Amino acid sequence: MNFKTENSTTPNGDWSQSKAFTNSGSSFPVLNGTCELDQENLALSNSGQPESIFTQDSGLHGIDVAAPSDITDLNNQSGYQYNNNLAHDLYFTGSMEMPTTQHPYITNTNNHLSYSNSSEEFSPIGNNMSPDSTGGANSNNFTSGNKRKASNESFSPLSGHHYGTESGNNNNNNGTSRSSQSSSHKSRKKLLDEKDAALIARDDSELTEEELQMKRKAQNRAAQRAFRERKESKLKELEAKLLASEEERQKLLDELEQIKKQNISIATENEILKHNGMGNINNDVQIGNLSSYGRLQVDKFNFPKTQKDFIEHVLQGTNHQLKDENKDKVYNDNQGHKLLALGAVWDYLQIKAEEADLDFNSIDFNDVMEKLKGNEKCHGYGPAYPLELVNEAIESSLN
Protein backbone atom coordinates (compact mmCIF):
# COMPACT_ATOMS: atom_id res chain seq x y z
CA MET A 1 0.00 0.00 0.00
CA ASN A 2 1.20 3.50 -0.75
CA PHE A 3 1.18 6.26 1.86
CA LYS A 4 0.39 9.75 0.65
CA THR A 5 0.62 12.96 2.68
CA GLU A 6 -1.47 16.05 2.30
CA ASN A 7 -0.39 19.66 3.09
CA SER A 8 3.22 18.57 3.10
CA THR A 9 5.98 21.14 2.68
CA THR A 10 8.76 18.67 2.22
CA PRO A 11 9.77 17.76 -1.29
CA ASN A 12 9.21 14.05 -0.73
CA GLY A 13 6.10 14.45 1.34
CA ASP A 14 7.75 12.84 4.39
CA TRP A 15 5.67 12.27 7.43
CA SER A 16 6.84 13.82 10.73
CA GLN A 17 5.69 13.95 14.33
CA SER A 18 3.88 17.21 13.80
CA LYS A 19 1.63 15.70 11.15
CA ALA A 20 -1.22 13.33 11.50
CA PHE A 21 -2.14 10.65 9.05
CA THR A 22 -5.41 9.03 8.22
CA ASN A 23 -6.48 6.18 6.01
CA SER A 24 -8.46 7.65 3.16
CA GLY A 25 -8.38 4.50 1.01
CA SER A 26 -10.42 2.28 3.32
CA SER A 27 -13.44 2.49 5.54
CA PHE A 28 -11.24 1.35 8.44
CA PRO A 29 -8.21 3.36 9.67
CA VAL A 30 -4.73 1.97 9.58
CA LEU A 31 -4.67 1.61 13.34
CA ASN A 32 -8.15 0.88 14.62
CA GLY A 33 -9.37 -0.67 17.82
CA THR A 34 -7.71 -4.00 17.07
CA CYS A 35 -4.76 -2.64 15.02
CA GLU A 36 -5.16 -5.46 12.45
CA LEU A 37 -3.62 -5.22 8.97
CA ASP A 38 -4.22 -8.57 7.26
CA GLN A 39 -4.41 -10.19 10.69
CA GLU A 40 -1.04 -8.72 11.74
CA ASN A 41 -0.24 -6.21 14.55
CA LEU A 42 2.02 -3.32 13.69
CA ALA A 43 4.50 -1.82 16.17
CA LEU A 44 5.71 1.65 15.20
CA SER A 45 8.78 3.46 16.44
CA ASN A 46 10.03 7.02 16.04
CA SER A 47 13.76 7.12 15.67
CA GLY A 48 13.83 10.88 15.37
CA GLN A 49 15.50 10.65 12.02
CA PRO A 50 14.47 13.02 9.25
CA GLU A 51 13.55 9.96 7.16
CA SER A 52 10.02 8.79 7.69
CA ILE A 53 9.04 5.22 8.15
CA PHE A 54 6.32 5.69 5.61
CA THR A 55 7.21 7.46 2.40
CA GLN A 56 5.30 7.99 -0.73
CA ASP A 57 6.84 4.90 -2.25
CA SER A 58 6.54 2.76 0.88
CA GLY A 59 4.37 -0.29 0.11
CA LEU A 60 2.07 -1.50 2.83
CA HIS A 61 -0.46 -3.82 1.20
CA GLY A 62 -1.76 -1.18 -1.22
CA ILE A 63 -3.52 1.11 1.30
CA ASP A 64 -3.14 4.91 0.90
CA VAL A 65 -2.56 7.01 4.05
CA ALA A 66 -2.88 10.82 4.12
CA ALA A 67 -2.21 13.38 6.87
CA PRO A 68 -4.73 16.17 6.32
CA SER A 69 -3.60 18.54 9.07
CA ASP A 70 -1.25 19.03 11.97
CA ILE A 71 -2.00 17.50 15.31
CA THR A 72 -1.13 18.90 18.70
CA ASP A 73 0.94 17.24 21.32
CA LEU A 74 -1.43 16.20 24.08
CA ASN A 75 -0.07 16.46 27.61
CA ASN A 76 3.46 16.53 26.20
CA GLN A 77 3.36 12.76 25.86
CA SER A 78 5.92 11.08 23.69
CA GLY A 79 5.05 8.78 20.86
CA TYR A 80 2.78 8.95 17.93
CA GLN A 81 -0.64 10.45 18.48
CA TYR A 82 -3.79 10.66 16.46
CA ASN A 83 -6.00 13.66 15.83
CA ASN A 84 -8.53 14.05 18.61
CA ASN A 85 -10.50 16.60 16.61
CA LEU A 86 -11.65 14.00 14.09
CA ALA A 87 -15.17 13.16 15.19
CA HIS A 88 -15.33 9.59 14.06
CA ASP A 89 -15.76 6.47 16.13
CA LEU A 90 -13.31 4.48 14.06
CA TYR A 91 -10.32 6.78 14.74
CA PHE A 92 -8.16 6.13 17.75
CA THR A 93 -6.41 8.95 19.65
CA GLY A 94 -3.95 8.90 22.49
CA SER A 95 -0.44 7.82 23.27
CA MET A 96 1.11 4.51 22.41
CA GLU A 97 3.69 2.84 24.59
CA MET A 98 6.59 1.38 22.68
CA PRO A 99 7.98 -2.01 23.65
CA THR A 100 11.50 -2.14 25.01
CA THR A 101 12.36 -5.47 23.42
CA GLN A 102 13.17 -6.10 19.81
CA HIS A 103 10.22 -5.50 17.55
CA PRO A 104 9.14 -8.17 15.18
CA TYR A 105 8.62 -5.45 12.58
CA ILE A 106 11.77 -3.57 11.55
CA THR A 107 12.57 -1.12 8.79
CA ASN A 108 15.19 -1.57 6.17
CA THR A 109 16.94 0.90 3.90
CA ASN A 110 14.13 0.68 1.36
CA ASN A 111 11.62 1.87 3.98
CA HIS A 112 9.65 -1.41 3.70
CA LEU A 113 8.35 -3.24 6.72
CA SER A 114 9.59 -6.76 7.29
CA TYR A 115 8.57 -9.34 9.83
CA SER A 116 11.02 -11.37 11.89
CA ASN A 117 10.13 -14.93 12.81
CA SER A 118 12.92 -15.16 15.39
CA SER A 119 10.64 -15.23 18.40
CA GLU A 120 7.18 -16.49 19.03
CA GLU A 121 6.67 -13.91 21.76
CA PHE A 122 6.20 -11.11 19.26
CA SER A 123 4.19 -13.00 16.68
CA PRO A 124 1.19 -11.19 15.23
CA ILE A 125 -1.11 -13.56 17.00
CA GLY A 126 0.80 -13.49 20.29
CA ASN A 127 0.82 -9.68 20.77
CA ASN A 128 -2.45 -7.96 21.43
CA MET A 129 -2.15 -4.39 20.18
CA SER A 130 -5.76 -3.50 20.88
CA PRO A 131 -6.48 -0.68 23.34
CA ASP A 132 -7.67 -1.31 26.85
CA SER A 133 -11.34 -2.09 26.71
CA THR A 134 -11.93 -0.71 30.21
CA GLY A 135 -10.46 2.71 29.52
CA GLY A 136 -12.37 5.74 28.28
CA ALA A 137 -11.64 8.09 25.41
CA ASN A 138 -8.71 9.71 27.21
CA SER A 139 -7.02 6.45 28.23
CA ASN A 140 -6.84 4.50 24.96
CA ASN A 141 -3.29 3.22 25.36
CA PHE A 142 -1.81 0.31 23.38
CA THR A 143 -0.33 -2.56 25.34
CA SER A 144 1.92 -5.15 23.87
CA GLY A 145 2.32 -7.46 26.84
CA ASN A 146 -1.18 -8.85 26.76
CA LYS A 147 -1.48 -12.02 24.78
CA ARG A 148 -4.66 -13.32 23.32
CA LYS A 149 -5.87 -16.46 24.99
CA ALA A 150 -8.21 -18.98 23.48
CA SER A 151 -11.58 -18.92 25.15
CA ASN A 152 -13.74 -21.86 25.99
CA GLU A 153 -15.96 -20.91 23.10
CA SER A 154 -13.21 -21.26 20.47
CA PHE A 155 -14.08 -23.43 17.54
CA SER A 156 -13.16 -27.08 17.65
CA PRO A 157 -14.28 -29.72 15.17
CA LEU A 158 -15.36 -31.99 17.99
CA SER A 159 -16.37 -29.39 20.60
CA GLY A 160 -19.91 -29.93 21.75
CA HIS A 161 -20.37 -32.78 19.25
CA HIS A 162 -20.29 -36.46 20.12
CA TYR A 163 -20.92 -38.05 16.78
CA GLY A 164 -20.96 -41.68 17.82
CA THR A 165 -23.17 -41.05 20.85
CA GLU A 166 -25.51 -38.81 18.90
CA SER A 167 -25.72 -41.37 16.09
CA GLY A 168 -26.64 -44.13 18.51
CA ASN A 169 -29.08 -41.87 20.30
CA ASN A 170 -30.63 -40.86 16.99
CA ASN A 171 -31.06 -44.51 15.98
CA ASN A 172 -32.60 -45.33 19.34
CA ASN A 173 -34.83 -42.30 19.11
CA ASN A 174 -35.88 -43.26 15.57
CA GLY A 175 -36.69 -46.80 16.66
CA THR A 176 -38.62 -45.55 19.66
CA SER A 177 -40.50 -43.03 17.56
CA ARG A 178 -41.39 -45.67 14.96
CA SER A 179 -42.63 -48.09 17.60
CA SER A 180 -44.62 -45.34 19.29
CA GLN A 181 -46.10 -44.30 15.94
CA SER A 182 -47.02 -47.91 15.16
CA SER A 183 -48.66 -48.41 18.54
CA SER A 184 -50.52 -45.10 18.25
CA HIS A 185 -51.68 -46.05 14.74
CA LYS A 186 -52.98 -49.39 16.00
CA SER A 187 -54.76 -47.74 18.89
CA ARG A 188 -56.37 -45.18 16.57
CA LYS A 189 -57.43 -47.94 14.18
CA LYS A 190 -58.95 -49.93 17.02
CA LEU A 191 -60.79 -46.88 18.30
CA LEU A 192 -62.06 -46.14 14.79
CA ASP A 193 -63.28 -49.72 14.39
CA GLU A 194 -65.14 -49.50 17.68
CA LYS A 195 -66.76 -46.23 16.64
CA ASP A 196 -67.77 -47.71 13.29
CA ALA A 197 -69.26 -50.77 14.98
CA ALA A 198 -71.23 -48.61 17.39
CA LEU A 199 -72.46 -46.41 14.54
CA ILE A 200 -73.49 -49.38 12.39
CA ALA A 201 -75.40 -50.93 15.30
CA ARG A 202 -77.64 -47.86 15.66
CA ASP A 203 -80.99 -47.66 13.89
CA ASP A 204 -81.27 -45.44 10.83
CA SER A 205 -84.33 -43.69 12.24
CA GLU A 206 -82.29 -42.39 15.14
CA LEU A 207 -79.58 -40.87 12.95
CA THR A 208 -79.38 -37.55 11.21
CA GLU A 209 -78.48 -37.12 7.57
CA GLU A 210 -74.82 -36.54 8.41
CA GLU A 211 -74.75 -39.54 10.73
CA LEU A 212 -76.38 -41.68 8.03
CA GLN A 213 -73.64 -40.69 5.62
CA MET A 214 -71.02 -41.53 8.23
CA LYS A 215 -72.76 -44.87 8.81
CA ARG A 216 -72.62 -45.73 5.10
CA LYS A 217 -68.92 -44.91 5.07
CA ALA A 218 -68.39 -47.08 8.13
CA GLN A 219 -70.28 -49.94 6.45
CA ASN A 220 -68.08 -49.57 3.37
CA ARG A 221 -64.97 -49.67 5.51
CA ALA A 222 -66.23 -52.75 7.33
CA ALA A 223 -67.01 -54.49 4.04
CA GLN A 224 -63.58 -53.65 2.65
CA ARG A 225 -61.94 -54.84 5.84
CA ALA A 226 -63.85 -58.13 5.71
CA PHE A 227 -62.91 -58.56 2.05
CA ARG A 228 -59.23 -57.97 2.84
CA GLU A 229 -59.37 -60.44 5.72
CA ARG A 230 -60.96 -63.11 3.51
CA LYS A 231 -58.43 -62.42 0.80
CA GLU A 232 -55.51 -62.69 3.23
CA SER A 233 -56.95 -65.90 4.69
CA LYS A 234 -57.37 -67.41 1.24
CA LEU A 235 -53.88 -66.35 0.29
CA LYS A 236 -52.42 -67.98 3.38
CA GLU A 237 -54.37 -71.16 2.67
CA LEU A 238 -53.10 -71.25 -0.91
CA GLU A 239 -49.56 -70.65 0.27
CA ALA A 240 -49.85 -73.58 2.70
CA LYS A 241 -51.21 -75.83 -0.07
CA LEU A 242 -48.46 -74.75 -2.41
CA LEU A 243 -45.84 -75.51 0.20
CA ALA A 244 -47.35 -78.95 0.86
CA SER A 245 -47.52 -79.72 -2.87
CA GLU A 246 -43.90 -78.68 -3.29
CA GLU A 247 -42.89 -81.02 -0.48
CA GLU A 248 -44.92 -83.89 -1.99
CA ARG A 249 -43.43 -83.19 -5.41
CA GLN A 250 -39.94 -83.34 -3.95
CA LYS A 251 -40.72 -86.67 -2.28
CA LEU A 252 -42.04 -88.11 -5.56
CA LEU A 253 -38.95 -86.90 -7.38
CA ASP A 254 -36.75 -88.63 -4.82
CA GLU A 255 -38.73 -91.88 -5.14
CA LEU A 256 -38.56 -91.68 -8.92
CA GLU A 257 -34.82 -91.24 -8.75
CA GLN A 258 -34.52 -94.32 -6.53
CA ILE A 259 -36.70 -96.37 -8.90
CA LYS A 260 -34.56 -95.30 -11.84
CA LYS A 261 -31.46 -96.45 -10.00
CA GLN A 262 -33.11 -99.80 -9.21
CA ASN A 263 -34.12 -100.25 -12.85
CA ILE A 264 -30.58 -99.57 -13.96
CA SER A 265 -29.29 -102.13 -11.46
CA ILE A 266 -31.84 -104.75 -12.57
CA ALA A 267 -31.10 -104.16 -16.24
CA THR A 268 -27.39 -104.54 -15.59
CA GLU A 269 -27.97 -107.77 -13.69
CA ASN A 270 -30.16 -109.15 -16.51
CA GLU A 271 -27.47 -108.40 -19.05
CA ILE A 272 -24.93 -110.23 -16.93
CA LEU A 273 -27.22 -113.27 -16.51
CA LYS A 274 -28.05 -113.30 -20.19
CA HIS A 275 -24.40 -113.24 -21.11
CA ASN A 276 -23.66 -116.08 -18.68
CA GLY A 277 -26.61 -118.14 -20.07
CA MET A 278 -25.41 -117.83 -23.66
CA GLY A 279 -21.99 -118.95 -22.51
CA ASN A 280 -23.49 -122.08 -20.91
CA ILE A 281 -25.40 -122.93 -24.12
CA ASN A 282 -22.26 -122.61 -26.18
CA ASN A 283 -20.45 -124.88 -23.74
CA ASP A 284 -23.24 -127.51 -24.04
CA VAL A 285 -23.00 -127.41 -27.83
CA GLN A 286 -19.26 -127.95 -27.73
CA ILE A 287 -19.61 -130.86 -25.31
CA GLY A 288 -22.32 -132.45 -27.49
CA ASN A 289 -20.12 -132.36 -30.55
CA LEU A 290 -17.49 -134.31 -28.66
CA SER A 291 -19.91 -136.91 -27.28
CA SER A 292 -19.90 -140.57 -28.42
CA TYR A 293 -23.37 -140.24 -29.93
CA GLY A 294 -22.08 -137.68 -32.41
CA ARG A 295 -25.36 -135.76 -32.31
CA LEU A 296 -26.24 -132.19 -31.51
CA GLN A 297 -27.40 -131.75 -27.97
CA VAL A 298 -30.40 -129.45 -27.62
CA ASP A 299 -31.49 -127.92 -24.37
CA LYS A 300 -34.27 -129.97 -22.85
CA PHE A 301 -36.49 -126.96 -22.54
CA ASN A 302 -36.36 -126.35 -26.30
CA PHE A 303 -38.93 -129.12 -27.08
CA PRO A 304 -41.57 -128.75 -29.84
CA LYS A 305 -44.84 -127.20 -28.83
CA THR A 306 -46.96 -128.26 -31.82
CA GLN A 307 -47.29 -131.18 -34.19
CA LYS A 308 -45.78 -129.19 -37.03
CA ASP A 309 -42.67 -128.37 -34.97
CA PHE A 310 -42.33 -132.05 -34.05
CA ILE A 311 -42.53 -133.19 -37.69
CA GLU A 312 -40.04 -130.56 -38.89
CA HIS A 313 -37.60 -131.41 -36.14
CA VAL A 314 -37.70 -135.17 -36.92
CA LEU A 315 -37.34 -134.73 -40.69
CA GLN A 316 -34.50 -132.23 -40.28
CA GLY A 317 -31.34 -133.59 -41.97
CA THR A 318 -33.15 -136.39 -43.88
CA ASN A 319 -34.40 -136.81 -47.45
CA HIS A 320 -37.91 -137.82 -46.44
CA GLN A 321 -40.93 -135.77 -47.32
CA LEU A 322 -44.36 -136.00 -45.75
CA LYS A 323 -47.54 -134.92 -47.38
CA ASP A 324 -50.19 -133.26 -45.31
CA GLU A 325 -52.87 -135.83 -46.18
CA ASN A 326 -50.62 -138.70 -44.98
CA LYS A 327 -49.11 -137.19 -41.80
CA ASP A 328 -51.77 -138.72 -39.48
CA LYS A 329 -52.01 -142.07 -41.30
CA VAL A 330 -51.89 -145.33 -39.32
CA TYR A 331 -51.59 -148.60 -41.22
CA ASN A 332 -50.12 -152.14 -41.08
CA ASP A 333 -47.22 -153.46 -43.07
CA ASN A 334 -46.99 -156.80 -44.83
CA GLN A 335 -46.02 -158.67 -41.66
CA GLY A 336 -48.95 -157.19 -39.77
CA HIS A 337 -46.92 -154.69 -37.77
CA LYS A 338 -48.66 -151.39 -37.10
CA LEU A 339 -46.93 -148.29 -38.45
CA LEU A 340 -47.50 -144.66 -37.35
CA ALA A 341 -46.77 -141.61 -39.48
CA LEU A 342 -45.12 -138.60 -37.79
CA GLY A 343 -48.41 -136.87 -37.13
CA ALA A 344 -49.80 -140.05 -35.63
CA VAL A 345 -46.66 -140.42 -33.46
CA TRP A 346 -47.26 -136.91 -32.01
CA ASP A 347 -50.86 -137.75 -31.18
CA TYR A 348 -49.83 -141.08 -29.62
CA LEU A 349 -47.36 -139.30 -27.35
CA GLN A 350 -50.14 -137.01 -26.12
CA ILE A 351 -52.36 -139.99 -25.39
CA LYS A 352 -49.63 -141.85 -23.46
CA ALA A 353 -48.91 -138.79 -21.33
CA GLU A 354 -52.58 -138.50 -20.39
CA GLU A 355 -52.87 -142.21 -19.61
CA ALA A 356 -49.88 -142.14 -17.31
CA ASP A 357 -51.23 -139.00 -15.66
CA LEU A 358 -48.01 -137.26 -16.45
CA ASP A 359 -47.26 -133.69 -17.22
CA PHE A 360 -46.85 -133.05 -20.88
CA ASN A 361 -43.45 -131.52 -20.21
CA SER A 362 -42.31 -134.60 -18.31
CA ILE A 363 -41.67 -136.50 -21.56
CA ASP A 364 -38.29 -135.84 -23.11
CA PHE A 365 -39.36 -135.27 -26.69
CA ASN A 366 -35.80 -134.67 -27.78
CA ASP A 367 -34.79 -138.14 -26.66
CA VAL A 368 -37.82 -139.67 -28.37
CA MET A 369 -37.04 -137.91 -31.62
CA GLU A 370 -33.41 -138.97 -31.51
CA LYS A 371 -34.43 -142.62 -31.08
CA LEU A 372 -36.89 -142.47 -33.96
CA LYS A 373 -34.47 -140.92 -36.45
CA GLY A 374 -33.08 -143.41 -38.95
CA ASN A 375 -35.81 -146.02 -38.34
CA GLU A 376 -38.34 -144.77 -40.83
CA LYS A 377 -40.43 -147.20 -42.87
CA CYS A 378 -41.73 -146.07 -46.21
CA HIS A 379 -44.72 -147.69 -47.93
CA GLY A 380 -45.77 -144.91 -50.22
CA TYR A 381 -47.25 -142.77 -47.40
CA GLY A 382 -44.13 -141.03 -46.23
CA PRO A 383 -41.93 -141.82 -43.25
CA ALA A 384 -43.62 -144.02 -40.61
CA TYR A 385 -42.43 -145.69 -37.42
CA PRO A 386 -43.36 -149.06 -35.93
CA LEU A 387 -45.56 -148.87 -32.82
CA GLU A 388 -43.17 -151.08 -30.82
CA LEU A 389 -40.27 -148.65 -31.46
CA VAL A 390 -42.34 -145.67 -30.35
CA ASN A 391 -43.27 -147.41 -27.06
CA GLU A 392 -39.63 -148.25 -26.36
CA ALA A 393 -38.62 -144.60 -26.95
CA ILE A 394 -41.31 -143.36 -24.56
CA GLU A 395 -40.32 -145.81 -21.82
CA SER A 396 -36.66 -144.93 -22.12
CA SER A 397 -37.38 -141.16 -21.96
CA LEU A 398 -39.49 -141.62 -18.82
CA ASN A 399 -36.78 -143.58 -17.03
Swiss-Prot record:
Record-level GO BP terms: positive regulation of DNA-templated transcription
CDD domains for this protein: bZIP_YAP
Transmembrane segments: none
An annotated Gene Ontology molecular function: DNA-binding transcription activator activity, RNA polymerase II-specific
Subcellular localization, as worded in the UniProt entry: Nucleus
Composition-biased stretches (Low complexity): 167-184
Main localization (coarse): nucleus
GO cellular component, as recorded: nucleus; RNA polymerase II transcription regulator complex
Residue spans of biased composition, Polar residues class: 103-145
Gene3D superfamilies assigned: 1.20.5.170, YAP1 redox domain. Chain B
Key word Transcription regulation present: yes
Region feature (Basic motif): 215-234
Domain bZIP, first and last residues per copy: 210-273
Region (Leucine-zipper): 235-242
Highest taxon in the source lineage: Eukaryota
Keywords from the UniProt entry: Activator, DNA-binding, Nucleus, Transcription, Transcription regulation
Residues covered by region (Disordered): 1-21, 103-197
Stated role: Transcription factor that confers fluconazole resistance in S.cerevisiae by activation of the PDR5 gene. Can also activate the transcription of S.cerevisiae genes involved in 4-nitroquinoline-N-oxide resistance.
Family: Belongs to the bZIP family.
Protein name: Fluconazole resistance protein 3
Gene source species: Candida albicans (Yeast)
Phylogenetic classification of the source organism: Eukaryota, Fungi, Dikarya, Ascomycota, Saccharomycotina
Gene: FCR3
